Amino acid sequence: MNLIILFLPFVGAFISGFLGRFVGTTGAQILTCACILTSALLSLYYWLSINELIIGLFSFEGDQVYFTDWNFLSNNTFINLGTWVDSEYIKISWEFTFNEITLPFLFTVLFISFLIHLFSVNYMANDPHIQRFFSYLSLFTFFMAILVTGANYFVLFVGWEGIGVVSYLLINFWFTRIQANKAAILAFNTNRIGDMALSIAYFVMLPAFGSADFSTVFSLPAYINQTTITIIGFLLLVGAMAKSSQIPLHNWLPGSMEGPTPVSALIHAATLVTAGSYLLIRSSPILEYAPTVLLVITIIGASTAFFAATCGLVQNDIKRIIAFSTISQLGYMVMAIGLSQYNVALAHTLFHAYFKALLFLGAGSVIHAFGDIQDVRKMGGLINFLPFTYAVMLVGTLSLLATPFLTGFYSKDLIIELAYGQYSFSGTYAYILGSVTAGLTAFYSFRLISLVFLTKPNGNKQNYLNSHEASITVIIPLAVLAIFSIFFGYVTSDLFVGIGSDFFANTIFIHPNNISLVEAEFSMSLIFKLLPTIFSLAGTLFALYLYNYNPHFIDSLVENNLGKKVYGFLNGKYYFDVIYNNYIISKGLQFGYNISKEIDRGVIELIGPYGMSNVLYSTSANIAKLDTGIITTYALYITLGLLSLLFIVFAPMLVNTTINDEFRLIILFIFTLIVNSAYLNKKLSK
């Protein structure tokens, strides 16, 4: 059953991609959806069965049914498909594991992927390359499953590279668009930085641990030199920064919105961008012995969350607003990892996947219904034309804002509380930025809701006349994701983040000094717990007031000089792209040009074949000049040679203190004769 879960997506991708002309458009859609759905259901069944969650969940007393507790028995299943590398020093196997970390991730990836496949049936109905699109989606899901279930770092790396390549193909699916080409190349090259760091981490890891298997590596960090562990931790962090879009390697994600909207939902909500956080969560035994790395992770995560939230304030593309929201939420996940709260980071990763996929698919429904318009300033009043889409997007937005008792509430607010519960500089820094970010998130989220659905219509009349809710294949994914955005956090929060839950006892390691869940739960003042919620409420009310009742205030705010500078700074994304283009990329290209000009076509020619032939030719020509045919010249050569020989023999006497001065004069006289003879030789040769 395990192999069926893994390889069914590949079967669907292979048949749809290579046999698409035979199975047809409808056949490719049905086949890929069926394969992904089967894998998702099997992964859910396997997750429930190995942890015995089906038994003992409820107790009955009379007519009342009580929820008792999660009753699970830890089980870690390994499947070995054979040896990949077998040498004297290392053995690497094609091995997969199914445990308490991999199965929740696997189910989330497969289930959301199925919903996105189903959504794409209608969304991509008029595209001429449907088979290729569904093949890419299924192939991406397959590689993500490989990444999640790999039992060693090298199998994980296969999935890591696979999703990188397929994400390039998906972002560049409409390859006739120049902007799609640029976005795909940017995403691919930025992720290569992370891939290089991850590769170097493996090269450091192998001699340090002697293995790449998780079971071996995770048992040894306490006995390894801390400098080595810190280096490995930093390299893993760089890899995660590129894949999970953390500053300064964040710039690829907003541009990747050039791909189809289902791609945005699959890659930038549920799967690819969470791969970096999954890598760090999986490597918790290494990071726990590298406190410097944890400090850096916390600062980077908090800074990314705040940075993306401020940039999201001024975006006008509906997909880019949600993209910056994704970067901001990824910052929360990374921040939780830096605080050593890996289970909370994992919970937020899974919870976020549902409501962010809902927001992306809701945006896709709006774009599809409104004539492919993506600028929120050209919309407005769509609540009357797309009431169902408005309802589900409102649910996703409220869950994103950690509204009490919705899915996002059980992880996002807890991350901020845990930051305060650290009682450290990094914890305070994370708490302040996390709380402010919560308010900013509320503002730009309800700015989107207001401009798209609530304000007066600002679009083309024909677009409004043609607007309508999509077919059932769009409504079902939105409805299911909305249900998960409401209830999934409530149902699973005690399992993932509940005090006393040992669900991750055998898969996540937290150093005893870093456990702060009790402090965050019981020692915090109520005001510090409520502060993020207060900021969120303030941001919501402020956005609703400004864009529905006083829209001219924003215009007047931006029209003054300071407002223009701030707006330009935020709209320019802190000028990261300008810095990269002017000071890194252009300088790198110039350096490469100089290398090509001076070395590839200059120095190499001088010291290569051309240079060697020139040296030999000039040397032979100079030697030929010595053959003058004049006897006196030959006599001079003989004299010069003898004098040189005498000088070589007697030269050491110049520094010998036991030799008389008369002998030193004789030696200097011989040297003078050599110089004169050489001078005469030069004159005669002319």
Curated annotation (Swiss-Prot):
| Keyword entries, A-Z | Electron transport, Membrane, Mitochondrion, Mitochondrion inner membrane, NAD, Respiratory chain, Translocase, Transmembrane, Transmembrane helix, Transport, Ubiquinone
Transmembrane stretches, by residue range?
3-23, 40-60, 101-121, 139-159, 160-180, 198-218, 222-242, 261-281, 293-313, 321-341, 350-370, 382-402, 432-452, 472-492, 526-546, 635-655, 665-685
Q: What is its EC number?
A: 7.1.1.2
The record's annotation in Pfam families points to: NADH5_C, Proton_antipo_M, Proton_antipo_N
Entry GO CC:
mitochondrial inner membrane
Membrane topology per record: Multi-pass membrane protein
Reaction(s) catalysed by this chain, per the record, are: a ubiquinone + NADH + 5 H(+)(in) = a ubiquinol + NAD(+) + 4 H(+)(out)
Q: Does the keyword Repeat apply?
A: no
Q: Name one GO biological process term.
A: electron transport coupled proton transport
Q: Where in the cell is the protein located?
A: Mitochondrion inner membrane
- Which enzyme class? translocase
Reading the lineage from the top rank, the first entry is Eukaryota
- List the molecular function annotations (GO) for this entry: NADH dehydrogenase (ubiquinone) activity
Q: What does this protein do?
A: Core subunit of the mitochondrial membrane respiratory chain NADH dehydrogenase (Complex I) that is believed to belong to the minimal assembly required for catalysis. Complex I functions in the transfer of electrons from NADH to the respiratory chain. The immediate electron acceptor for the enzyme is believed to be ubiquinone.
**What NCBIfam families has UniProt attached to this entry?**
NDH_I_L, PRK06590.1
Family membership, please give it.
Belongs to the complex I subunit 5 family.
Q: By what name is this protein known? A: NADH-ubiquinone oxidoreductase chain 5
